[in-house]
């Protein structure tokens, strides 16, 4: 019964569905509207606002199988993954939830009945923990459920503070909290370990399988516990743990999902030892990596993307350890989809993107993996002690892309630890250097704190009255301004848009009779809008009324560029894949810049298709609509939110026909046709996994096209062709140039041969050895190597030294026939000469080259060759 993990998942959800619960799909691994979380790490994450009373749902009972990741940040299991029976970067949490509906009695009954009746687990194998003072739960467990008192364990405050207990759950320092009951399974006395609360509780015999949290208090800032008006329930059961029990195994890595992935990895890498811990690491990591990419995370050097990169690189390193000679990690995705069943729906839709992203990251790391491992191996072999210094760990990170935990993973296998504090010091020093190198003059407004509130009226008007509520000069609040003063003016109401969401701030004028304040920029300061600029005439004081006039032309051009970023975002997702997410943008009156996640460069044909699709949507002349609604409504409409952003309860949703719908607080055109034309001017990578498109619109796009046409016409004139035949004419010209270059090379070879015949006759005898030392004129540096080969052949046995002096540059070459290399090394001789002309060089015993920066010293340097050789050939 329920022998597969997929069957167990279905049984759990069906059980709670029949008991009146709404089955809710797993939310994304990237928490939406909760920047406090790096990744979704519990089933209750998506219901957090419901528990806090900030979100209302149409149901009061829910159940889910939530995909979770614990790697990076506070919840980081990465170091232990693969080495223990139950640590994972990715896991599924089965859960049932009550939002002010049922409480302890039903929650306990639901859990017990599912385990003992549906799954038919032996009751004698189960024991339960409760919070020490939770007598209500004790009575339910003993009197109603029938758990023997000896199988019920009270756990008190065991973490050094009141309510700090394994059996008391709290969301934070304040807010909803309450006692919990945990159900444990006894794997048998053949496994070491003791019951919860005993000194042996850390053993593997008694394993927690279900945690039932009773949220019944609201913790105040002073520590007081106030009863919640509507107590709720949050439960969680790790599917991997219960699957291990149902499948009669002890380690999670022995269940069907992991065994399929382990066997597939072993097949790909031709490994026979299925107990190898590296196989466990890889089987775990493919789950987190594949599902993170499916949910829009791409490998990068910051935030979630860097955690993903660390996991991928750890898996690749373990593959290398097993003998992988080629990319292998991405090949596990089809097996993962197969074993995950219904839980892999999102993965199926993004399979191609996931595989390409994994392969690209693996190939990128492969370029430095071997060399980095060699450096690390050398450092460990030379190590005196059992701690690797942080500087070496940082070098591996900075030069070879080794995350510090990957270095620690390698060291661990040799019982060596990494000085992570030293690593952090080296990292901090690098950041300081980067900041110092990149410092520009800082505007005092960067740190300006303003408490005032400004009403923004600029969605519907560009001219409006406003009253001055505050004035700031050089970061300090002042009451008045005189002509010539530079300041920030805050109004109670303004049509000026303050820079945010990538859209630059408006420019324009604040004026009254005899008064004019030139606004050069507009910024947001909390809930206030600050107009930055200078008073060009008159005087101003707090309380004065002004007319605010936005520069209409600049605002309109900015709106063209902002609106087209929405079309561009939608086009990229449609043509490249739904993994594409916005990573940043800059929109002003001149151009737009759009950064997005993508694992490879955008091909020219893809870029053209994106541009064409955007222009098609412009020509369709969609009407733009902007509506304010609550977040749930926006989600239901399919509005795209920027992951990691914190949105208010009410959000503004901008829709462009049936093509684009996004959350956005910026200003836009009335219809897409207003944009006129969209032209991409460049595309490139700005970081691993992040691409950037720069583009222009409207009149700027027309000017860009006209400029390209003018350049094409100039090229046509130079080629004596019309515009239509420029490409064919240019190709013919390049073919001819290639042919001429080949002929020129052949002529140079003939000239070198002729020159060598003449030069060979100039050789002199030094202690019975033929020696030719010559400064050459009219010979290219590229011909030196061939010329010295020719001369050595002509001499039969001898030494050749040639030099060329150019503009502030010297080129040298020394050739020694093999019969003489025991007496004279070409590298030593060329180094001696180079040191006299401001250079250095080296090479093989029979041929070496060098460069220098002092051509004026070449003659004297060459004069020293014969004495140098005379001494060595004596």
Curated annotation (Swiss-Prot):
EC identifiers of the protein: 6.1.1.7
Enzyme class: ligase
Reaction(s) this enzyme catalyzes, per UniProt: tRNA(Ala) + L-alanine + ATP = L-alanyl-tRNA(Ala) + AMP + diphosphate
Annotated keywords: Aminoacyl-tRNA synthetase, ATP-binding, Cytoplasm, Ligase, Metal-binding, Nucleotide-binding, Protein biosynthesis, RNA-binding, tRNA-binding, Zinc
UniProt xrefs under InterPro entries: aa-tRNA-synth_II/BPL/LPL, Ala-tRNA-lgiase_IIc, Ala-tRNA-ligase_IIc_anticod-bd, Ala-tRNA-synth_IIc_core, Ala-tRNA-synth_IIc_N, Ala-tRNA_ligase, Ala_tRNA_ligase_euk/bac, DHHA1_dom
GO molecular function: alanine-tRNA ligase activity; aminoacyl-tRNA deacylase activity; ATP binding; tRNA binding; zinc ion binding
Gene Ontology CC: cytosol
Annotated binding of Zn(2+), by residue: 562, 566, 664, 668
Cofactor note: Binds 1 zinc ion per subunit.
Localization in the cell: Cytoplasm
Coiled coil stretches, renumbered: none
SMART domains, per the entry: tRNA_SAD
Main localization, broad class: cytoplasm
Cofactor(s) the protein needs: Zn(2+)
Family annotation (PROSITE patterns): AA_TRNA_LIGASE_II_ALA
Keyword Cell membrane: no
GO biological process, one term: negative regulation of DNA-templated transcription
PANTHER family the record matches: ALANINE--TRNA LIGASE, CYTOPLASMIC, ALANYL-TRNA SYNTHETASE
Function field: Catalyzes the attachment of alanine to tRNA(Ala) in a two-step reaction: alanine is first activated by ATP to form Ala-AMP and then transferred to the acceptor end of tRNA(Ala). Also edits incorrectly charged Ser-tRNA(Ala) and Gly-tRNA(Ala) via its editing domain.
Family note: Belongs to the class-II aminoacyl-tRNA synthetase family.
NCBIfam families: alaS
Domain statement: Consists of three domains; the N-terminal catalytic domain, the editing domain and the C-terminal C-Ala domain. The editing domain removes incorrectly charged amino acids, while the C-Ala domain, along with tRNA(Ala), serves as a bridge to cooperatively bring together the editing and aminoacylation centers thus stimulating deacylation of misacylated tRNAs.
Protein name: Alanine--tRNA ligase
Species, as recorded: Shewanella sediminis (strain HAW-EB3)
Gene: alaS
């Amino acid at each position: 019964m329920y022998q597969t993990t997929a069957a167990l998942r279905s049984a759990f959800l069906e059980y709670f569905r029949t008991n009146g619960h709404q089955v809710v799909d797993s939310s994304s691994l990237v928490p939406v509207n909760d920047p406090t979380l790096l990744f979704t790490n519990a089933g209750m994450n998506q219901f957090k606002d419901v528990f806090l009373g900030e979100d209302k749902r149409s149901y009061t009972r829910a159940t889910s199988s939530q995909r979770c990741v614990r790697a990076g940040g506070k919840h980081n299991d990465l170091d232990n993954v693969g080495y223990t029976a139950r640590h994972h970067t990715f896991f599924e949490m089965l859960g049932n939830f009550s939002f002010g509906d049922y409480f302890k009695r039903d929650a306990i009954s639901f859990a017990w009945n599912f385990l003992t009746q549906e799954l038919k687990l032996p009751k004698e194998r189960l024991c339960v923990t409760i919070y020490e003072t939770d007598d209500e739960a004790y009575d339910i467990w003993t009197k109603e459920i029938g758990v023997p008192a000896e199988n019920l364990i009270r756990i008190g405050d065991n973490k050094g503070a009141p309510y700090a207990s394994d059996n008391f759950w709290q969301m934070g320092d304040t807010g909803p909290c309450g006692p919990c009951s945990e159900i444990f399974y006894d794997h048998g006395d053949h496994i070491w370990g003791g019951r919860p609360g005993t000194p042996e509780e850390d053993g593997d015999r008694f394993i927690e399988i279900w945690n039932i949290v009773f949220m019944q208090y609201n913790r105040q800032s002073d520590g007081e516990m106030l009863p919640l008006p509507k107590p709720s329930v949050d439960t969680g059961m790790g599917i991997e743990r219960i699957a291990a029990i149902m499948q009669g195994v002890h380690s999670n890595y022995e269940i069907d999902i992991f065994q399929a992935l382990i066997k597939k990895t072993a097949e790909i890498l031709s490994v026979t030892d299925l107990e190898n811990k590296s196989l466990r690491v890889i089987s775990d990591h493919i789950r987190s990596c594949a599902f993170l990419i499916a949910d829009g995370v791409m490998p990068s050097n910051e935030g979630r993307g860097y955690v993903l990169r660390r996991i991928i690189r750890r898996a690749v390193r373990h593959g290398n350890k097993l003998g992988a000679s080629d990319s292998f990690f991405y090949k596990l995705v089809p097996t993962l989809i197969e074993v995950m069943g219904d839980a892999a729906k999102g993965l199926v839709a993004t399979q191609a993107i996931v595989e390409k992203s994994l392969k690209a990251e693996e190939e990128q790391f492969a370029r430095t993996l071997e060399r980095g491992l060699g450096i690390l191996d050398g450092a460990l072999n030379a190590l005196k002690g059992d701690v690797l210094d942080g500087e070496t760990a940082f070098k591996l990170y900075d030069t070879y892309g080794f995350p510090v935990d990957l270095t620690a993973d390698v060291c661990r296998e040799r019982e060596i630890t990494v000085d992570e504090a030293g690593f952090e010091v080296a990292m901090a020093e690098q950041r300081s250097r980067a900041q110092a190198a990149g410092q520009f003059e800082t505007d005092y407004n960067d740190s300006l704190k303003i408490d005032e509130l400004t009403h923004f009226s600029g969605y519907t008007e560009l001219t409006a009255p406003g009253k001055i509520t505050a004035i700031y000069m050089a970061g300090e609040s002042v009451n008045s301004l005189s002509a010539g003063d530079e300041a920030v003016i805050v109004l109670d109401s303004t049509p000026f848009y303050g820079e945010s969401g990538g859209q630059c701030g408006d420019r324009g004028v604040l004026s009254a009779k005899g008064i004019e304040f030139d606004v050069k920029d507009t910024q947001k300061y909390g809930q206030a809008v600050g107009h930055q600029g200078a008073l060009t005439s008159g005087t101003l004081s707090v309380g004065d009324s002004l007319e605010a006039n936005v520069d209409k032309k600049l605002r309109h051009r900015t709106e063209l560029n902002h609106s087209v970023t929405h079309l561009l975002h939608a086009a990229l997702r449609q043509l490249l894949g739904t993994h594409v997410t916005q990573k940043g943008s800059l929109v002003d009156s001149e151009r737009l810049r759009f950064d997005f996640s993508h694992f490879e460069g955008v091909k020219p044909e893809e870029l053209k298709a994106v541009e064409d699709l955007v222009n098609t949507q412009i020509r369709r002349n969609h009407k733009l609509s902007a509506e304010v609604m609550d977040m749930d409504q926006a989600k239901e409409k399919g509005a795209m939110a920027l992951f990691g952003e914190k949105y208010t309860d009410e959000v503004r949703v901008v829709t462009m026909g049936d093509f684009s719908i996004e959350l956005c607080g910026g200003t836009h055109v009335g219809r897409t046709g207003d944009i006129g034309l969209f032209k991409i001017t460049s595309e490139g990578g700005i970081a691993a996994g992040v691409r950037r498109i720069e583009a222009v619109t409207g009149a700027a796009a027309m000017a860009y096209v006209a400029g390209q046409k003018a350049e094409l016409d100039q090229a046509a004139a130079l080629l004596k062709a019309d515009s239509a035949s420029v490409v064919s004419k240019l190709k013919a010209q390049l073919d001819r140039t290639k042919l001429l270059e080949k002929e020129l090379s052949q002529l140079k070879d003939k000239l070198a041969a002729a020159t060598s015949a003449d030069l060979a006759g100039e050789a002199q005898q030094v202690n019975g050895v033929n020696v030719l030392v010559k400064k050459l004129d009219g010979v290219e540096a590229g011909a030196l190597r061939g010329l010295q080969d020719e001369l050595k052949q002509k001499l039969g046995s001898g030494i050749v030294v040639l030099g060329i002096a150019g503009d502030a540059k010297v080129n040298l070459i020394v050739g020694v026939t093999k019969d003489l290399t025991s007496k004279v090394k070409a590298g030593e001789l060329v180094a001696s000469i180079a040191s006299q002309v401001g250079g250095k060089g080296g090479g093989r015993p029979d041929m070496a080259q060098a460069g220098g920066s002092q051509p004026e010293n070449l003659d004297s340097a060459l004069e020293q060759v014969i004495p140098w050789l005379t001494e060595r050939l004596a």
